[in-house]
A protein has these predicted regions:
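Conserved N-terminal phosphate-binding loop of PLP-dependent enzymes in the Aspartate aminotransferase
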Residues: 1-333
């Protein structure tokens, strides 16, 4: 109950709220879909190109990226439809993204048959592209107009990673349901669905659950993480880390570094070739050589040429600089 109350206080959803605990981010997403369908009595789900929601069959269906996550694993559950995600780097405007939603309603499914719309406030696997407040408001308006449940998936971007406890706080828009996992308990397995009470209560009694749902040790770990975030000022530290990494990368002044995107300490930078095109080979090389020197890096993005930087918010400056120096040494060799 302590964790439920704490999340209820912090979640960017007004009114009466409830929380439900599971083990993995994918479970949280799956249960959001179950809740939304129970509330609306509708089957359809809309997600976004580049979105990442997990590795279960439903979550793979929601995910807007085929390789390596969906190929050879079908058929996928449906009906699920993918709208465009607006991002300057992807040459997709907000108007184009909203038009793609309208086309889904015209060509694929009537909005009266859509149960939920799910989006990451900051895309993870998709390349750390950020939802703007204006686009979030447009989605909120569309969902309100058609009685669609709006879900914000904060499994990767939540819990201080972006400089606020939830990235949702920076959008000025409230979802109906939201997910949390990963950093929720500092890597200990626990996830959560947080949402409006009237929607959370929609499934029949016993319809939601799990063997390890809300296990005491995981809940205590999550409460401890929330204490550390407050006591060590990790929201401010997140912003400081992101700004420092961005300044470092820009200071290298390398033509091979393309777009740099960050919200707090959630940062990604693209590697490009001399023609300005995605350089997957250079990205793979950077990951491999960094690993040889003791630094783990992960790639992301629709073209696989972005490096995601997700350092612990408790990282010491000396350790952070050591990692940055490894990146510099490889990119400038």
């Amino acid at each position: 109950m302590d964790l439920t109350e704490k999340l209820g206080e912090k979640a960017a959803i007004s009114g009466e709220k409830k929380a439900f605990f599971l083990t993995t981010g994918a479970e949280a997403v799956e249960n959001c879909i179950k809740i939304a369908r129970a509330k609306t009595g509708r089957p359809g789900i809309i997600s976004f190109v580049g979105g990442w929601h997990g590795r279960t069959l439903m979550c793979m269906s929601l995910t807007g990226k085929v390789l390596p996550y969906k190929k050879n694993f079908g058929p996928m559950p449906g009906p699920v439809f993918h709208a465009l995600f607006p991002a300057e780097e992807l040459n997709v405007t907000e108007a184009q993204a909203l038009h793609s939603l309208e086309m889904i309603f015209q060509a694929d499914i009537d909005p009266s048959e859509v149960a939920a719309m799910i989006i990451e406030p900051v895309q993870g696997e998709g390349g750390f592209h950020q939802v703007t407040p204006s686009f979030a408001k447009s989605l909120r308006d569309i969902c309100d107009e058609h009685g669609i449940v709006l879900i914000f998936d904060e499994v990767q971007c939540g819990f201080a990673r972006t400089g606020t406890l939830f990235a949702t706080e920076q959008l000025g828009v409230e979802p109906d349901l939201m997910t949390s996992a990963k950093s929720l308990a500092g890597g200990y397995p626990i996830s959560a669905v947080i949402g409006r009470a009237d929607i959370m209560d929609a499934p029949q009694v016993g319809g939601l659950g799990g063997t390890y749902s809300g296990n005491p040790l995981a809940c205590v770990a999550a409460l401890a993480v929330m204490e550390v975030i407050e006591e060590e000022n990790l929201l401010e530290r997140s912003i400081e880390i992101g700004d420092k990494i961005e300044a470092f990368l820009k200071g290298l002044n390398l033509s091979s570094i393309g777009h740099i995107r960050h919200k707090g300490a959630m940062l990604a930078f693209e590697l490009i070739d001399s023609d300005g095109k995605p350089d997957v080979e250079a990205t793979t090389n950077l990951k491999a050589k960094s690993f040889e020197q003791g630094l783990l890096l992960a790639s992301c993005g629709m073209y696989g040429n972005a490096i995601r930087v997700m350092v612990p918010l408790t990282v010491e400056d000396e350790v952070l600089q050591e990692g940055l120096d490894i990146i510099k040494g490889i990119l400038t060799a």
